[in-house]
């Protein structure tokens, strides 16, 4: 799972016309910072900023302007960004969201109709900064020829079991403008 996440996130670097596998100034050069969703991230002298309500709305607007469908959008973020969101009243308090589930359960659920997913597999573009993505399901694709296959075998010489898992898969970018990468500080 970590390897698949890493491959998909590496493609996220290329969203909005970015360079996949760039270094220095070319690393994540089309990513935006989390605070406003429009200022370009600079990897050389990091300007990453905490995710905000305005930043999320601006990234959604970027997808809207590219005629990306409203359904099947996902916000994928590192745990530090999820922690920042839980500190924003608009996303947690009952008067804003109705049920107040985010306070009770710690689960964010949806923001502006976008499903929120938290992963510790988010890459680090520079220093401790962490990357995330707001994207539509058509932005990136994962194709599996063979799903995860697990096997176990008893190894007498080690008096234990050998457990292996493998998969055959590939990833690709389908729609360049159907996603936006963003960067937040790692701490």
What are these regions (language model features)?
Residues 49-88:
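Hydrophobic, aromatic-enriched interface-forming segments
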Residues 41, 57, 64-67, 98, ...:
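Generic, low-specificity signal for short hydrophobic/alpha-helical stretches with a mild N-terminal bias
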Residues 1-24, 66-79, 116, 148, ...:
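Long, contiguous amphipathic alpha-helices that act as assembly "spine/axial" helices in icosahedral shell
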Residues 1-62, 181-187:
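Alpha-helical scaffold segments that mediate packing/assembly in large oligomeric complexes
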Residues 44-47, 88-187:
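Sequence/fold signature of self-assembling virion shell proteins
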């Amino acid at each position: 799972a970590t390897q698949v996440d890493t491959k998909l996130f590496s493609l996220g670097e290329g969203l909005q016309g970015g360079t996949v596998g760039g270094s220095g100034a070319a690393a994540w050069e089309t990513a935006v910072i989390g605070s406003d969703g429009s200022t370009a991230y600079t990897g050389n002298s990091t300007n990453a900023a905490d995710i905000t309500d305005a930043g999320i709305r601006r990234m959604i607007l970027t997808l809207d302007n590219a005629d990306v469908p409203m359904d099947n959008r996902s916000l994928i973020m590192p745990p530090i960004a999820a922690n920042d969101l839980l500190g924003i009243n608009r996303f947690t308090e009952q008067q804003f969201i109705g049920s107040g589930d985010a306070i009770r359960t710690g689960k964010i659920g949806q923001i502006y109709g976008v499903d929120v997913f938290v992963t510790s597999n988010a890459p680090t573009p520079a220093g401790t900064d962490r990357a995330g993505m707001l994207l539509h399901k058509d932005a990136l694709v994962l194709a599996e020829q063979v799903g995860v296959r697990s096997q176990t075998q008893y190894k007498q010489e080690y008096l234990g079991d050998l457990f292996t898992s493998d998969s055959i898969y590939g990833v690709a970018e389908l729609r360049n403008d159907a996603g936006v990468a963003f960067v937040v500080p790692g701490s």
